[in-house]
Amino acid sequence: ASNSYPTMKLIAKRYELKTAGSSGQQHRVILIPGSSGKHYSQIMNGAPFDVFFSADIERARLLEQEGRILAGTRFTYALGRLILWSSIDNYVDSKGDVLNKKDFRYLAIANPKLAPYGKSAEEALRSLGLWTNLKERLVRGENIAQTFQFISSGNAKLGFVAYSQIMNPGISIDGSFWEVPQSVYEPIEQQAVLLQDSDIGREFLSFVKSDESLSIIYESGYGLP
């Protein structure tokens, strides 16, 4: 999932260092970011991934139902948090009332058909009674990373992204944001699965569940399962 890419880079680096120290043979983790929907399609078409980190339950569950994962390996690794963000300081208020203004041309969301955070953004807008008024102003990113770029570049004045994206360790993110109440969208349970019968894959997933990794996940702006 694109939203968890920076977090997974930190976890993968920590894992690689740990394996080098314990066994003398460092395991290398190759991360391939993209929308959960796109990766799901690639896996169904035979992409040789070992592990899949989705931004939702749905794709992980579908892969399980299709017999594409190792039995008993599906688990929740993080709870996503949706925010409305603008790269402009003091533009987004603490209640999200900016959505009722008419001074922005575009509102960015990830494609709801491909990206779980886009689906959550649509759910939130519908729950808040704003979908009808704002749907013509929506610009859709293929994934949450592209959606973030739309906003950070100024092509969209504001949009819905993952809280983890502005909590990216080592990078100072300017702007203003409102954390969307979790009562207006379905919980974003991000799940992982093991796709290949691999000892290293099992070991890496076990490391993701460790207190060391959970601390990284929490500090990156996620809730813990």
Model feature map: region roles:
Residues 70:
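Extracellular glycoside hydrolase catalytic/binding regions
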